[in-house]
Amino acid sequence: MNTLEDLEKKINSELTTKINNTEIKHDQLYIKIDKDDLVDVTLFIKTNQDTKFRQLIDITAVDYPENSQRFKMVYLFLSHEYNQRIILSYSINENEVIPSLTNIFPAANWMEREVFDMYGVSFKDHPDLRRILTDYGFEGHPLRKDFPLTGHTEVRYSEEQKKVISEPVKLEQNYRNFDYESPWE
């Protein structure tokens, strides 16, 4: 595909029933889909000779706690041959299980584990879905907007016990409310 406009037309014509919306901005093609179409759309953009998006750059989530579908899943793909990028996205409910891309892109393994660890999003058929960035006994998911800024526990090395211990967070100072409104306006 020579241009993003050509790519957009190709994808819209080939995947008519699987694409909710497309938009070109910032030299990238943004595609909104339903979660059930993720595997089909991903296989198409990876294997089709006119697209060749053979590198998965990243998988992440965005937390919108006020929305009925709390999380927006975002997938970034790169076509080295055409020097183009696609960003796939869809929204899901809080406890929804979504398809894993590890069978299509092995690199999705750690990316999906990171999303699971940070947001609590589960991936169906993932080969090793466990925490990757936080401790094994860690409670909660730190990138959710309802997670406390200080966390629940403090992990530190105890000189007395000669080991790493975990204890509830003790703040030296209470939270302060800052009023940023100007009295002169």
What is the meaning of each model-derived region?
Residues 1-185:
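Terminal low-complexity/charged segments
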